[in-house]
């Protein structure tokens, strides 16, 4: 068991009491063993060495009292493992040591000698006849908890993992003690017990009003103020009057310096609140203000070590208490919570919600019947007075019932409402009936009927509240509500609601309003019998108290209109000075009270400026006014919390009287129901069996190895606390208001990952990869590092020899010689493939220059031919034959002889180039032909296309149409036969001379061009190749684009040529200006001639154009020559 747990459970039990509790279970066994014990062996007196004591089952946990001197020890036979308090008579026998046996001083391990209890223990045994009772006065059952057993509920679990140490900075010098102030007099046991548990657990304290909940909170706040260095302590209360009231009490009891405390509300500017959070440690504020400061970043949730929640029964639903605790727990788990209330809740579920929302692990609850607080509770005389309605009320009820009868009959006609008396209508009953009707027959009713019923429900619900005011509060509040209802309808433009106008025009309604207006003109008119009895009760109370007495009285009313009517009547009575105490909200007929006005009203009431305070629900909680001797509840509430809060305003320092004014019937039943509900809930909470406490949220702040001891002493109050009695609010100075509010601070929990998170990692629960930390530049220094000497930097002679031996020599060759390698012999290009890849490293990563070099080597390697990539030389010599292209010779000026041809020009090379080009073109044509034929099933159409080609060939040889651009259009027009024409037909793109293979066997295979004599035609002869290309649906621009695209892909795949001819613009790039294969063949037989106008042959197929070598620009020739069209099929060799 942990030491702190042991101390928390049994810290107030003396050691002797603990020994007694542990030995109770073995008393009976010890008594029976004494009767059956053997006679002890006698021995002589004298100093002897101490006998060894065998260990027992209690030796590890209980410290035995000191044993008697050795001369008085008398061994007694015992039962194994038993203890005895008195030795058996006749056990001592005097004799000499010589007569004693050898084993006289031996003791059996099975029969140990237990220690003899002290005289104090024996005196406590006689006090076992006391009876222990519960808080309700009943005797505890003996079989419920044995004397040597520990309670079942443990604050700490040994099987749970160790708690995380607190992040708060602690004052280790102060952790050894916790202070209990004695400034208020004698110590109350229940307060001491609650403070001790509240320091180490999240505690819910439920005490009746006036029993010192503020003292408990101030004591715990004082100790956490001592234990921590910079942590914040926050006291939250629902309203500013309650918070300001706790300021004076805590500063006057705990002795915390006033300079470290502040009061913050919504009226304090954010700039000043931010400054207070930076400089103060103790805060009194409302929960709404605390939530705003936490959300905007003014307050750090991790810095709050203690949160005191006043009126904790509000911590349900979506109230600000719940939001504050939830927000703080998102960032910090090391926080202590102390919840104070007089009424925890009216239901078991409500109390469990408070436990869950605040993280309560321990409950301290007392009732007025508890034994330990009975002596501190002053008597309260409760006087319940019931009333019957007055004659005026009966008359008004009758007239109003007649006016509402038509509307109620409409509901009865639809089987919605079965009541006969309209004065029994309630807002909740009408709302319930409306929901049930819409869920049943109303959902299928006609739209006109449905709209009419909704209008009736709306009118009756607004009037049901006025019926309640008439029954429980009087005629005047009832009349004010009806006057407002009438003015709202009459002020509307147009006709308004038909049903409302029907009600206002009813004769009974008009008669009732006129009657009430006549009564209200009378000054002595009281609209309710409660008002008459209230005035008499208050006047009698002040008369009995005397003229100079400081007695006070508080009247509670549920509605503001009733409170104002009560104040008007009481101020007309003698000895009464009444004032109203309401909330901040403005109503339709009156303004609310600001927090400053509320505080001033309470101070005047305490000082005697007013002796009667008429308050609404805002005065039910927390008001600590000791001189209140009379409480009058003008109306009863069904909530036991509100009822007990009202009663708790009296009897705090002396006996008080409570007067309940109830109407017979419903109001009286509500009071009895609330009273029974309160007693039942108190018993359930005291039992604690039906609640689940949150031990997991109540972490320990003080380290487990530290056990603070109580220090009961008088606490010195600083002088500054007594000199300045004003509230410690921040002052609104011009300098403070000129400061700008800091930007919103987003508090983050510990070990949270900020920034962008990988979506894939978030789905699979993997941590997101963090970006590499950018190294920071070295900091600049004012001093320079000393330059080391050259001898320390360079290699020494021995190091140089070792370096040359290891890195510059190879093993001996077969000729017994050592081969030396110099740095000049290193071949940096020996392993080109390895230089283009980053190799794997272990500890040292590749540098920036290494990555750049590898990238450069990789780029250079990819630019080479894959087949010749690793063949030396690597592209240093141009292997292209662009110089062997046939170029016309340059004629010398002034001479008729042709110029000398260049060294790269020869007929053999020219013929080889032409043959290779024709072979590549023929292979492409054959592959395309086979592909097109295999894909198409239109054999007949292919035959027609061949016939068209034959006709085109005959036309080309016999026709006399001139060659030119316009011929293409005419050729296309002549082609208008019924033959099938396929788009992008590559066979038709080529001319007749490229596809004919009938004369291949008659040729000798030479490149002289003799077999082409029959095909030589003039320049003015029209060829089929001129107009067949125009039938291709592809436009010339698209042909050129596709040609350039294919040419670009081929250049990137192969190695780049050494020489790249210039590219012409769009105006010069034309298919008509590109040389044809026939033109290249004709140039071999040409002779240099004078300048003439250039003539371009018909365009050839675009697919074969990629395989032709690049040509240099032609020079103008002197004479036009005939062109020879060559057939590439003749050069095809199998």
Curated annotation (Swiss-Prot):
This is ATP-dependent DNA helicase MPH1. It catalyses: ATP + H2O = ADP + phosphate + H(+). ATP binds at residues 207-214. ATP-dependent DNA helicase involved in DNA damage repair by homologous recombination and in genome maintenance. Capable of unwinding D-loops. Plays a role in limiting crossover recombinants during mitotic DNA double-strand break (DSB) repair. Component of a FANCM-MHF complex which promotes gene conversion at blocked replication forks, probably by reversal of the stalled fork. One of its GO terms (molecular function) is four-way junction DNA binding. Belongs to the DEAD box helicase family. DEAH subfamily. FANCM sub-subfamily. Pfam families: Helicase_C (PF00271), ResIII (PF04851). Residues 1-126, 938-1134 are annotated as: Disordered. Interacts with the MHF histone-fold complex to form the FANCM-MHF complex. Its main location: nucleus. The keyword Lipoprotein does not apply. One of its GO terms (cellular component) is nucleus. CDD domains: DEXDc_FANCM, FANCM_ID, SF2_C_FANCM_Hef. Residues 967-984 have a biased composition (Basic residues). Residues 93-106, 1022-1036 have a biased composition (Polar residues). Residues 538-699 form the Helicase C-terminal domain. It is an enzyme of class 3 (hydrolase). Residues 985-999 have a biased composition (Basic and acidic residues). Residues 194-362 form the Helicase ATP-binding domain. A motif (DEAH box) lies at residues 310-313. It is found in: Nucleus. Its EC number is 3.6.4.12.
